[in-house]
Amino acid sequence: VIIITGKGSCFCAGYDLSYDNSKDLPYHASKTDGFWPRHVVEGAFKIWDLSTPVIAEVHGYCLAGGTELAASCDLVYCSDDAELGYPVVRSMSPPDNQFFPWLLGMRNAMEMMLTGETITGKQAAENGFANKSFSAEILSKEVEKIASKVAKVPSDIQAINKRSIHRQMEIMGMRDGITAGTELQALAMHSNSTKEHLKELSSGLKEALDKR
């Protein structure tokens, strides 16, 4: 079993905005229009397709790309006071990885997409994004207990157990739906509002983010 968590005060506050996108990507994605969301989705399904169970231990901020990382994991456990959301919808685009409707249901997903507001770790567990939430003080200990239970099952059986759930989700269209969603993210990057926001970002990150 694999546990993914953040070092320091948060799980993940999003993509590294200082990264040079002109560099080769770690996964194959042709650099045509929409290459970035395709690359993100491909990376998410690398975790999805692992035979080993993957657990996300979420504390502090879990925003934008951080929510995509957590959503790709098999089990998600949050601190009660964690903050999860995709604030980028206020200024640029929907998520690269369209997992919200699948995990949260239509109404909860729509509210997050139209407002850009965050939810707490406790709400994430209530809404279906996470399995459970715990107080921050005991989160790691509780996740270790769960990981120990998962690890007791033989790995060959666990691989089939994991795949049995994924097979049903894929029959319902989850993989195809998330992959198709990359086209909407790519389309959003051509909107006038997004182009204007990118100009604002180049002038000053904090000022641009504070505006939205």
Name every feature range the model reports, one short phrase each:
Residues 45-158:
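Crotonase-fold acyl-CoA enzyme core
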Residues 6-42, 206-208:
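Glycine- (often His-adjacent) and acidic-residue-rich active-site loop
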Residues 1-5:
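Conserved CoA-thioester-binding segment of acyl-CoA-metabolizing enzymes
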Residues 43-44, 181:
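Alpha-helical packing segments of well-folded alpha/beta enzyme cores
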Residues 11, 116-121, 141, 145-148, ...:
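C-terminal alpha-helix plus adjacent terminal tail
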Residues 34-41, 137-140, 175:
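Non-membrane alpha-helical structural segments and their capping/turn regions in soluble enzymes
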